[in-house]
Amino acid sequence: MWLFHGYMPEFNQKGEKMSGKQLKISEKKRFPVFTFLFFFILLCVAGFMFYMAFKEQVPYWISDFKSKQVQNEYTSFGEEADGTLPYDFADKKNEKKNTKEKPAKTKNIPQDWNGVDWNGLKKMNPDIIGWIRIPDTAVNYAILKGTSDNYYLYHHMDGSYNILGSIFAEKGTSLQLDDAHTILYGHNMASGQMFGQLSNYTDTDFWKNHSYVYIYMPDRTMTFAIYDVYNCLDNDETYTIGFTLGSNDFEKWIKKTLKKGYYSTEFKPAGDEQIITLST
């Protein structure tokens, strides 16, 4: 590396001519200094790159830690069982207080009724209106609704700032999530957090093993079958809302979405059935 070579004078500081031996000794004394400098700079560059990579990952680690902390503190979902219908809040209210009878087992539905500490969640953040969960995936988060559609793009479910944001509904969405068409948004994170695993649904095997989405509300549990998977632009008619259940417009919209899917599924919704869209 010529940048690390210095000019070797022919005479020493006393004005005496230096012999070949002296020159050789001088070179040996100076070379380690430049070697040290080279490795020092290299170490600094490597350290800086490591620091930047570490700094970039910190928000992801913090978000993951805080999300799991909320999940562990405020939710407790049981194992899935066999059957077809969810154990709803209405069934819970109709049970006798001291009965030891368990609800009928259901297929792909959490065995416990709700498993969410709504009082605790509401105290943590009043903007929480529900909870979304796809078993055996990273999708296990509170659903939020803020006064602005942009707020929870960059705020955690506890209300603190975080670049990963949260799962949220548009500000015009019903607080009961009972609109004909509800859209829930979440970032498409390469880490798999938030809605980062939705891209896995391009694989039919993944869909077969994760074909239900569960929405938990303070008064009920809703089960949605995933009937369509596709990519679209943000101005696509997929994002149309404001439908009325059972209306012709809603039925036409459903038929159009069925034509967009990457593959056909066994589920075909009717115009009187509520639809949710998970969007990144």
Regions found by a protein language model. Name each.
Residues 42-280:
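Solvent-exposed, non-transmembrane regions of membrane-associated and secreted proteins
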Residues 19-25, 33-37, 61, 164-165:
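Short, motif-level signal for alpha-helix interfacial/capping segments enriched in acidic residues
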Residues 6, 34, 70-73:
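General helical structural elements
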Residues 4-6, 14, 41-43, 51-52:
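Sec-dependent N-terminal signal peptides of Gram-negative exported proteins
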Residues 32-46:
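Hydrophobic H-region at the start of alpha-helical membrane spans
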Residues 2-31:
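N-terminal Lys/Arg-rich, disordered targeting/topogenic segments
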